[in-house]
Amino acid sequence: MKKRLLWRGIDAEVHEVSLGQNFNPNDYDIFFIGGGQDFEQSVLLKDLKGEKGKNIIKAIEDEKVFLAICGGYQMLGQYYKTWDGKQCDFLGALNLYTVGEKKRLIGDFSFKLDE
């Protein structure tokens, strides 16, 4: 993403926010949230239960821009239910949920929200 901005003459700084590290959402213009396997998501979810999660919700409520891929967008939603019925509660910042199936769906998605 940084490289694409630089190609367009837009200067950008990238700040990584690690596990256990909080951030001020007012200090950022855009947020990127990647994904991971179920175990890695469970580790991250523990980290999101505190101030970091509240700050992500605040950034969404303040209409900040997010690019969330893979499990990143799932973690912004209400919950993820695995194909075998286990439910993982997520941030609830967005009114969406994910239900897994035995056969995984992999590819690009596009969503349109009703206002």
Where are these regions (language model features)?
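Short acidic, glycine-rich loop/turn motifs
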Residues: L5-W7, K112-E115
